[in-house]
Structures are given as structure tokens and as C-alpha cells.
Amino acid sequence: MIKLSGRAKPIGLPGLVDPGVWRVCQASETPTEHPLAYLVRDGDDHVPGYGLYLTQGPDVAVPGPALQLPADLAHLAAGDVIGVAPDGRRITVLWKQAATHNSVLLTEQCDNYCLMCSQPPKDRDDAWLFDRAKQIVSLLPSSARSLGLTGGEPTLHADALIDLLEHCRDTTPWLQLHLLSNGRRFADAGFATRYAQVGLADIMVGIPLYAPEAGLHDFIVQAQGAFDETVRGILNLASLGQCVEIRIVVQLHTVPVLTDLALFIARNLPFVDQVALMGLEMTGLARPNSAEVWIDPANYQRELLEATQILVTAGVATRIYNHQLCVLDERLWPYAVRSISDWKNDYLDICQMCSVRDACGGVFTTSGNRLSQQLRPIPP
């Protein structure tokens, strides 16, 4: 687990920090028109020409305005993209070069209100997040390979989303994108067509589907009519040749219908590019709703195995996210993916002696103590 934000100490700032998004660099990268924040190391504290300097200590002489980094951000490295508060007193890591997973928040608004949502919706104007996302994309190093676009529900801001995707196409055409959406806006054939016409080379939309029928799905997402719109959205995207991933969060309501949902997908949506069966992150709305959603993963292994076998037999690529190998049926290990983002990923003390630790995805630090009671080290 790593910290992604911390308090900085401004040194010699002439005023407010502008712009608010910077790429961290070192001596191998010469100053350009891009906002580059030079990460000062021992012996190179007099490199001139950069708009901002990042230091590890208070007594470093630099030829320009500087921010002294907190100890929690000592992991910053060249290529990372950071956000800096206008007064220079807070730094947030927005994209990390060494991270396995990077994602950009586009909005906290949503037209679903899922019982287990890890990012509870907020009804406020956050259109500035799309502008920041464009700045982040513009600063990504050429070594960047993938980026997640998440919310909230990004498609609520249709024009801003299309504009961002066009910016990605024109600025980082090699980048693999993964857009999280509830899929409902894609039921509008006109919007689905606009999305497809952007012409991105490598983008997938991850869309949740929680039941094989409207009643339960709409209850889980707390939005009447959502099931029909989501399914029509998936169909529209597929008809336009767009990549779609169906995401199923395995929780107390979905476990009893998991095999039926797998059959529904196998029979009606077998063309999707991937299905992700996802362990529950016990944060956000999942905490106050824990009695409604929590189930120990050890108690649904039969259903998870049956659902996986149904999907695989139908030729649907299947992945299992956010599960620990010691809890999974060993027949499911080939489908398990290390999927938890670095900043909220950790291992328990008992994991240190586990023979498969390096292949295991670990646990959510955000889930607190709400973890399976069957976690254990696997002997050699």
C-alpha cells in the first residue's frame, strides 16, 4: 500500500501554483512547454529552467519555486503525474509510472445508487475533473500503457466525455483505455454511435450486470428501468463493434442468482469480450449496508465455480478479481487476476509465509476487518 497524497511545504513560491497538474522529471528530461516538476536528488540541486522543484528536505538550494515533499511521497519518481493545490500545501499523485493500475476520476455524479458502491455519488458540479483528466493525459510519458476512466457515471457528461476520448485519440493513440460505466446512456443509439465514431484503437467499457432479470438488478442499483437500459446499451455497443466487459460484484444478493446470470450471459450476450467476477470491497455504501451485501467469499465457492464453468464453456473470457487464492477453489486459480490497485492493496502478516503470495492479489486495505474468515497461508 502506498500513500497518494500528502502535505507539502512551499519554498519560495511567488504566488499560487499554476497550472495545477505537473509531470515529475529528472535530469534526463529537458525543460519543455509542458509543466515539469524537477525531482531534486543529491548533487543535482542547481539544474535550472524548470517551473517547479520537488525536494526531500528543507535545506536544498534550488533555482526556482519548490515544494518540500512529505515522507509519505518519497516514492515519487520521474514520469509520475501529480496535482498541486493552488497554495502548494498539498500534493496528490494522479498517475504513477510504477503502478499496476492507474485510473482517473471523471465525476462523482451517478444515476445509479448501488447498495455496495465504493464511490458513493455526490450531487455537485465537478465538471473541472474532465479538464484535469485532459491535462493528465497530455502529460503521460510515452511509456504509459493503460489508463482507467471512472466515476460516478462518466456518460452523464456526454459532450465532455466524447471530448476527452477524442483528446486521448489525438494525444496518446497507443494508450489502452478502460471506461467504467453503468451502460445506461449507451441505450441511446445516437450516443453509442458518437462514442464509436471517436475511433479509439483500444478501449473497453466495463458495465455491471447483477441479475438475469430487471427486479433484482434494479433493486441493487436502486434505479427503476436500469436493467433494460443497461442490456440495450450492451447490445448497442456490440452492434457497433465496441469492446464490452460485464462486471459482476459477488455479494449477498447476487450469489443466489450467479449461475442463472452466467447462463443469461452465455445465452444472450456471449459476444461480450470479457466477464469479470468481482469480490466485494467493503467501503463506501457497502459499510452501512453490510448486512445487505456482505457474505464471506468462502461461502460462495460452489456458485462461483459453477458460474465460471458456464461462461468458459460458452467461450466467454472470464476473470476473477479481488479474491485471495487461499479462499478460492483451486480450480478457479487460473482465472484469478491481481486486480486491486496498489494504493489500497496489502497482505496480512499470515500471508508472509504463504507459498503463493506472489501470485495472489492480496486484500483491500479499504475493507478494514471485513475479510474472509478462511484466509490462511498455503504451505509449499
Where are these regions (language model features)?
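Canonical Radical SAM [4Fe-4S] cluster-binding loop centered on the CxxxCxxC motif
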Residues: W95-D131
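Flexible, acidic/Gly-rich N-terminal and inter-domain linker regions that tether
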Residues: M1-T100, E303-L304, I310-T318
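Conserved C-terminal portion of the radical SAM core fold
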Residues: L147, D202-G206, D228-A291, N299-H323
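Short Fe-S-cluster ligation motifs
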Residues: I136-T155, Y321, L375-P380
